[in-house]
């Protein structure tokens, strides 16, 4: 954590022994250990809180991204629905136009047996027409 080597730690111990003396050195070492332990605990606490905050921010971003995707999908779905409605309207208009231009053959056709009518045409009379279809003069 502090990147202190063995030789540096030994130097600090010798200076502490000279300054504090052999009677107060164990008490000072315990106090220093307590301070280091508290500092580490505080550091870990801050680190965990930061990680939770970062995780919460990541979740918030993911939620916003998911909401944006849902919003985009809803807009696309609505656009597709409008396209389908327009396509259905065009199809209906197309069918109506076809019926108007070409009347439905099912309602205007008759059965073949009833569709044929026998019409009697009288033969031409000989008194009014000549050989070549000209009128006779009297």
UniProtKB/Swiss-Prot annotation:
Main location, first listed in the record: membrane
Residue spans crossing the bilayer: 1-21
Keyword Cytoplasm listed: no
GO cellular component: TAT protein transport complex
A molecular-function term among this protein's GO annotations: protein transmembrane transporter activity
Membrane topology: Single-pass membrane protein
Keywords: Cell inner membrane, Cell membrane, Membrane, Protein transport, Translocation, Transmembrane, Transmembrane helix, Transport
The organism's place on the tree of life at top rank: Bacteria
Protein family per UniProt: Belongs to the TatB family.
Functional note: Part of the twin-arginine translocation (Tat) system that transports large folded proteins containing a characteristic twin-arginine motif in their signal peptide across membranes. Together with TatC, TatB is part of a receptor directly interacting with Tat signal peptides. TatB may form an oligomeric binding site that transiently accommodates folded Tat precursor proteins before their translocation.
Protein name as catalogued: Sec-independent protein translocase protein TatB
Upper lineage: Bacteria, Pseudomonadati, Pseudomonadota, Gammaproteobacteria, Lysobacterales
Gene that this polypeptide is encoded by: tatB
């Amino acid at each position: 954590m502090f990147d202190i080597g063995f030789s540096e730690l030994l130097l600090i111990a010798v200076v502490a022994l000279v300054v504090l003396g052999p009677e107060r050195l164990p008490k000072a070492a315990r106090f220093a250990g307590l301070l280091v332990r508290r500092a580490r605990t505080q550091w870990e606490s801050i680190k965990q809180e930061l990680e939770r905050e970062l995780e919460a921010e990541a979740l918030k971003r993911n939620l916003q991204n998911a909401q944006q995707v849902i919003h985009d999908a809803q807009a696309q779905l609505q656009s597709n629905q409008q396209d389908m409605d327009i396509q259905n309207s065009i199809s209906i208009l197309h069918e109506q136009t076809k019926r108007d231009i070409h009347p439905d053959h099912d309602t205007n056709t008759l059965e073949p047996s009833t569709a044929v009518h026998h019409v009697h045409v009288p033969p031409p009379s000989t008194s009014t027409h000549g050989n070549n279809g000209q009128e006779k003069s009297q």
